[in-house]
């Protein structure tokens, strides 16, 4: 880091919410070039392109005598087959290859509890920032203890602040700390012995402690979300830069490419700059920051860049490049867009994928388990076109898989947010299911609940999804079922909105009795009472969590009933809500 006339110069690059998108994405653009409209596809992002661009930026910083930092703002796990298959090992290898300086813990790192994070933290070569994660009461009998890993910069209970890292800045230091969602238990699955504490209070206390240590240049790497980052910047003094994630916001204007137009890169709030760089390794943010002796940012400039290949394609599979004059002109126009950087794939990073991970992923990508005769549409909340056509099938697969293992399940409830996409006509592969449709590697379980608890669960989930009398956590909680049907009246008083609740027992629909117990199945996430499902915590005993994932169950039912996605299977579907 260069210190000239008491100015400290830093270049910082950042990514967030990469969700195991190590390979490039086939990205469709919408272009209008002098009245010529076209919608070509382009190879976008991927870790090998990020590595190339980072190398260029490091060299630029070195030439300009600026120090260089590269951080990840959380959510590197769930999203593709690379996580479904390798459970964090590929993530550690690929992030190590990028040579990042630090990463903040995201909520999706904890979808499967602490154990995958603990194993990931043992493999990485960089600090994992988790400044409001209290590991002080972590159970001693765990195989991999986060509290004993010095790379994990968690909450310091004695000082009530985050542990931070420092990077040299000429004659001074830059401090970096991380914060994650403090309501983590509501949307993820952290172990009960490792709670998250208030992010705002932790931020204030941490800045005070960093100042006491004689450091006034402070960077927060946050996984709180874009609005929360801006609110924190307004409420807390002393932060130079907040590098954010969670909300997938791609700051800047990409509308000429048919993509989003968000606020300008580097929102300035209360002497703090706030940045975020999209999702899925499509883009990279970077900024030049100059600090004065008091730690104030006296110069800031930067941007988000979409990292693209050099050709435009006519199809999503990117097999046929556009070679006519219009596409060649469009290609040149895209390449000259101020927020686009065309770069090659770094051979070393690409080699890690090719040699260690791609062969197994390709094998699964080519393994066909079913044929879809028509589109099976997924929506979270039923709309004018109807409810999800997929979520009930997923719920049905839970019942099928659990019955195959001897569990006497009678119904299933699944949250809409656990299903991530629709199914289009054609071949359905293992990769489509485990990598796209049900990418969250969450197991399913079995439990016994009273009829009243079933009603309370359904009402709570819908109330949460539509914000009916509660401040909900999002539409993803909307419940889809197998072997249950019911009416929901939003106008009725809370606790009375579910009526005509029936369960399919054998071949007959029977009224659900309030005090009778029934055996159900849901994901382990739902069984923990997340997002409006808190009534399920009234289950008898603790329930059983199996080693069968959601994707495993759906693949199993399609393997046993390969025509389930055909036109003829619709009549056989015994799962509904009305």
What is the role of each PLM region?
Residues 1-308, 390-397, 412, 448, ...:
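Acidic, metal/ion-coordinating pockets
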Residues 2-24, 29-43, 51, 278-578:
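Catalytic centers of hydrolytic enzymes
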């Amino acid at each position: 880091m260069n210190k000239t006339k008491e100015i400290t110069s830093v270049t910082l690059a950042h990514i967030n919410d990469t969700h195991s998108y190590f390979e490039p994405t086939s990205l469709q653009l919408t272009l209008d070039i002098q009245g010529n409209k076209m919608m070509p596809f382009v190879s976008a992002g991927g870790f090998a392109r990020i590595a190339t661009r980072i190398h260029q930026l490091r060299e630029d910083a070195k030439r300009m005598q600026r120090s260089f930092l590269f951080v990840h703002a959380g959510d590197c796990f769930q999203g593709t087959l690379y996580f479904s298959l390798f459970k964090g090992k590929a993530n550690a290898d690929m992030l190590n290859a990028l040579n990042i300086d630090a990463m903040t813990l995201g909520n999706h790192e904890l979808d499967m509890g602490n154990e995958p994070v603990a194993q990931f933290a043992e493999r990485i070569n960089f600090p994992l920032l988790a400044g409001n994660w209290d590991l002080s009461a972590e159970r001693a009998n765990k195989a991999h203890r986060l509290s004993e890993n010095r790379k994990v910069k968690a909450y310091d209970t004695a000082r009530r602040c985050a542990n931070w890292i420092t990077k040299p800045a000429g004659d001074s230091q830059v401090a970096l700390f991380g914060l994650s969602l403090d309501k983590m238990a509501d949307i993820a699955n952290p172990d009960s012995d490792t709670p998250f504490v208030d992010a705002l209070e932790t931020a204030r206390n941490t800045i005070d402690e960093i100042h006491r240590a004689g450091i006034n240049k402070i960077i927060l790497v946050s996984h709180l979300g874009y609005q929360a980052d801006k609110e924190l910047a307004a409420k807390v003094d002393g932060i130079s830069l907040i590098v954010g994630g969670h909300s997938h916001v791609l700051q800047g204007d990409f509308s000429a490419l048919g993509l989003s137009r968000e606020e300008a890169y580097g929102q300035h709030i209360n002497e703090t700059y706030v940045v975020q760089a999209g999702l899925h390794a499509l883009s990279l943010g970077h900024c030049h920051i100059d600090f004065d002796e008091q730690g104030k940012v006296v110069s800031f400039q930067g941007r988000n860049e979409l990292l693209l290949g050099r050709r435009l394609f006519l199809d999503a599979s990117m097999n046929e490049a556009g070679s006519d004059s219009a596409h060649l002109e469009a290609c040149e126009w895209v390449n000259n867009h101020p927020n686009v950087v065309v770069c090659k794939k770094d051979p070393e990073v690409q080699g890690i994928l090719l040699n260690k991970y791609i062969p197994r992923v390709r094998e699964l990508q080519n393994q066909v388990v079913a044929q879809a005769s028509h589109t099976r549409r997924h929506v979270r909340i039923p709309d004018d076109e109807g409810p999800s056509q997929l979520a009930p099938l997923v719920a049905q697969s839970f019942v099928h898989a659990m019955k195959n293992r001897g569990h006497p399940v009678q119904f299933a409830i699944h949250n809409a947010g656990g299903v991530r996409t629709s199914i289009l006509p054609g071949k359905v592969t293992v990769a489509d299911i485990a990598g796209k449709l049900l990418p969250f590697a969450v197991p399913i379980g079995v439990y016994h609940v009273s009829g009243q608890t079933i009603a309370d669960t359904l009402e709570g989930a819908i109330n949460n999804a539509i914000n009916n009398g509660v401040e909900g956590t999002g539409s993803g909680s909307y419940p889809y079922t197998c072997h249950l049907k019911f009416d929901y009246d939003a106008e009725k008083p809370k606790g009375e909105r579910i009526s005509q609740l029936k369960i399919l027992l054998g071949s007959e629909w029977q009224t659900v009795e309030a005090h009778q117990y029934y055996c159900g199945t849901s994901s382990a996430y739902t069984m923990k009472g997340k997002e409006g499902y808190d009534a399920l915590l009234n289950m008898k005993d603790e329930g059983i969590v199996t080693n069968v994932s959601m994707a495993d169950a759906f693949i199993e039912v399609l393997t046993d009933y390969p025509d389930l996605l055909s036109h003829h299977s619709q009549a056989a579907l015994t799962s509904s809500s009305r």
